Amino acid sequence: MISTTIFIITSLAAVTYGRSHLTVPVGSTCTLQGPQEGYVTWWRIYDNGGFARPCDQPGTKFSCNGRDLTIINITSNEQGFYYGTNYKNSLDYNIIVVPATTSAPRKSTFSSSSAKASTIPKTASAMLKLPKIALSNSTAAPNTIPKSTIGIITAVVVGLMIIFLCIMYYACCYRKHEQKGDALLNFDI
């Protein structure tokens, strides 16, 4: 039971690891970079789990050039999660809008990542609502580790921990009943 809980928490942490958090002031313009190759489809994921394609919305609030999404004159309505994918690679952004008097980072294009614990339930909800969109991020800078590699390493470590716990359990139970012979080690012919 504990190993299952650890596996679920580790999996959710690996999924939210690549989310980029961006703080922008009200009234500014922000450009979100999509994956490098192919045509990118952008999705906006709302807090309630719903989603929409910002490039298909009427008006001049969102500008898409095939790869990047530009949000013009940001208000608090544009705060939330944005997801860009070319169905092979993806990038995930969390935009936090602050009042214009609050200082914000000068660079409006963001590509580093950090994850908050409060984003895990929102990410899980969004994953359940978007089954056709692949949630893998294999476009990485040369000095960063892709999410798929982190997921594989995490799965191997959890698997080895389970095997180790099973071996320890077997060793402890076998010591209690030393008079019993081990059927696997009995070679009587």
Swiss-Prot record:
<comment type="similarity">
    <text>Belongs to the adenoviridae E3_20 family.</text>
</comment>
<dbReference type="Pfam" id="PF02440">
    <property type="entry name" value="Adeno_E3_CR1"/>
</dbReference>
<feature type="glycosylation site" description="N-linked (GlcNAc...) asparagine; by host">
    <location>
        <position position="73"/>
    </location>
</feature>
<keyword id="KW-0325">Glycoprotein</keyword>
<protein>
    <recommendedName>
        <fullName>Early E3 20.5 kDa glycoprotein</fullName>
    </recommendedName>
</protein>
<dbReference type="InterPro" id="IPR003470">
    <property type="entry name" value="Adeno_E3_CR2"/>
</dbReference>
<dbReference type="InterPro" id="IPR003471">
    <property type="entry name" value="Adeno_E3_CR1"/>
</dbReference>
<feature type="glycosylation site" description="N-linked (GlcNAc...) asparagine; by host">
    <location>
        <position position="137"/>
    </location>
</feature>
<dbReference type="Pfam" id="PF02439">
    <property type="entry name" value="Adeno_E3_CR2"/>
</dbReference>
<comment type="function">
    <text>E3 proteins seem to be dispensable for virus growth in tissue culture cells. They are potentially important for virus growth under special conditions; E3 region may help adenoviruses to evade the immune surveillance of the host.</text>
</comment>
<keyword id="KW-0244">Early protein</keyword>
